[in-house]
Amino acid sequence: MSLKWCDSLGDSLMPSLCVRQENREAKIARVNMKAVASPQAQKTPTIAKIPVRWARTGIFVAYTAAGCWIALGLESIIRPEQENYRDWLWLAPFLLTMLTFYFVHMVQSGVGQNMERAGFYFVMVASVLALTGNLGVSLEQRTLATLGFPWGAVLWTVGLMGFGLGTWQAKVLPRYVALTLILLEPLSILTGVLLAPVSPLHPRGGYSAGVEKGLCLALIGMGLRAIMTRDKDDA
């Protein structure tokens, strides 16, 4: 018996039965509302859609990048003189960092945040400029070197801020990952300045700030690991 039938005919023939039917349907509606409001039903769709293979591989790449950055940074601090061969060693952690950003983007790509997507592509373009500029420095090609600094460095900083804000909005990764992306380059500059008394700043061949970048990449790896653990707990 439907409420429509009660409204049209039932009220005149069987009013008590119609009242019971209304109460029954109201109870069903309340039960459905409770089910939707329960924590189990409110699992965010982003968690369910996380591609596990991207997160798992991203953890490994992020930790590897962190180790490379820290090793490069410590070597620059222990041996503070300018060593141009470090410009070539820099390629390894930087490429791994680009790859880490790719995996960070992939695990939250299902959310469809325009800022996150735009920030990621912006960072990738800036990274290519930085790579080209670093090769220009190593090969002593000034035209190529200007692509890395100032253009590549400035765009990379701005892109990371946008990427971090988009990651914050996506709500897939922990908040500290978004903050790490936003502050990665400003803290890198600050680290280099603070370490200048023990590891002087050089035009090239000095990467003492690699220690900061390594710690940031380790935090990103921890964030990727956290969403995998959270996904297992919710399963």
Per-segment meaning from a language model:
Residues 13, 22, 228-230:
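General structural signal for secondary-structure boundaries
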Residues 34-234:
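Hydrophobic, aromatic-enriched alpha-helical segments typical of multi-pass transmembrane helices
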